[in-house]
Amino acid sequence: MNGIALLIGLGPLLGWGLFPTIASKIGGKPVNQIIGTTFGTFIFALVYNLVQGIALPSGAALIWSIISGIGWASAQILTFHSFTLVGSSRAMPITTAFQLLGTSLWGVFALGDWPSTSDKLVGFLALALIILGAWMTTWSEHKTDENSAKLRKAVIILLVGEIGYWAYSAAPQAAKIDGSKAFLPQAIGMCLVAICYAVYLKVKEPSQRSALAQGVSYKQIISGFFFAFAALTYLISAQPNMNGLATGFILSQTSVVLATLTGIWFLHEKKTKKEMVVTLIGLAIIIGAATMTVIV
């Protein structure tokens, strides 16, 4: 691995690692966060396509790519809602674990990954470790009924959101479209969800000011740039002449460590010393298990 490939591979670490913390720090409701995030992603993707001279795909490739973006934005709204319940430092390891589980199971049952019995044994052991690691990051030394109820609600929300994240990764595969060409139409799908969600909330509560007219929604464009930067650098990192799919994937998953720690440090999502130790061990288990899923 050369230096340039490593730097590009660390792009998702910075982008996806800082994205949830920045979105939470800027503030606003989930609708404000999804508007800014998707608009920022669209701007980033549009500039990238113009600079690279990439034409918008057509036909099934366009439709599947837009569906991919719709899936991501729908899931991300639910993830933002989970932040309001348990904070990003607890929500991010859970959603990362669910995405790893979803991606791995899709690969096994739909794409024929882990063909041998030994591969399956190692792979499913890794999935069990991912679940263990995610549970450890949510462990609380001083439990209360209220906090336990919030955590259960957040887990259910994130589990439902996994359907959208699965569509985000699986839909482009259905069209067999290159990731860089799917980038802009994915952003279009994301923006459609954000606008529809904002309009729905305005119709539901006419007396409330539309999120599309609130300044905080457009401040969130900054967080969208971080997400888009991570998504683009991951596409580049996963190319065979860079880090390759397996190494690129492992490097990208390290973002959960940064997302969790910055949530604790900068958003003051406090943990006791014991909780911090257990959280760090849980994060290490998730990263180690993610590595296992791509080497079998």
UniProtKB/Swiss-Prot annotation:
PANTHER family in the cross-refs: TRANSMEMBRANE PROTEIN 144
Annotated S-S bridges: none
Task of the protein: Could be involved in the uptake of ribose.
UniProt cross-references to InterPro entries, sorted A to Z: Sugar_transport
Keywords: Cell membrane, Membrane, Sugar transport, Transmembrane, Transmembrane helix, Transport
Gene Ontology cellular-component terms listed: plasma membrane
GO molecular function: carbohydrate transmembrane transporter activity
Name listed for the protein in its UniProt record: Putative ribose uptake protein RbsU
The organism's place on the tree of life at top rank: Bacteria
Regions crossing the membrane: 2-24, 34-51, 58-80, 90-112, 121-139, 182-201, 221-240, 245-267, 276-295
Family stated for the protein in its record: Belongs to the GRP transporter (TC 2.A.7.5) family.
UniProt-annotated location(s): Cell membrane
